[in-house]
């Protein structure tokens, strides 16, 4: 994961007044009342935001009442950076700490404005298991998340399953060549991203290039074969 490039994603926060904020991430927006109560989000999870002074927020994300992650957002005194520190709890019970630094892009004051990640760190790397499926297809399994996607590369939608997977999550893909796949991921028919899977010539690394709808930069995730 050291070769991965996880920074560059943008989030826009709009202050709607009355302690209510609109969060836009890529092509998805949610309106959250920052009063510490669980608020529904676009894909069925909930978010709670509790102000802790003028420059700090406590955020908790849940799915079916179970905590997925909890974190603090700290705004710098000059209002130019945010630092997010938190812990993710995976379905298998393991945890991973994370630290994200964001810079303000363009105008805005306080929490309001466009924020771009400049540094993203996790203490626990993700692991994938990839196996053959139904002849020329593949099954992608992430054990820690208990997430499974079995698909063929015929352009048809295949459903992704797992305890934290958004309802009606599907993927469709094609083989570009023996080392490259292109996959489009959707939720309820809405395209969220286009992802390219590339296996190195020596078969030792898998590189994912993820282009999320509404994001200015692609993410690169590199996995080493175990």
Named regions from a protein language model:
Residues 1-226:
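Hydrophobic small-molecule pocket/channel-lining residues, especially in calycin-type beta-barrels
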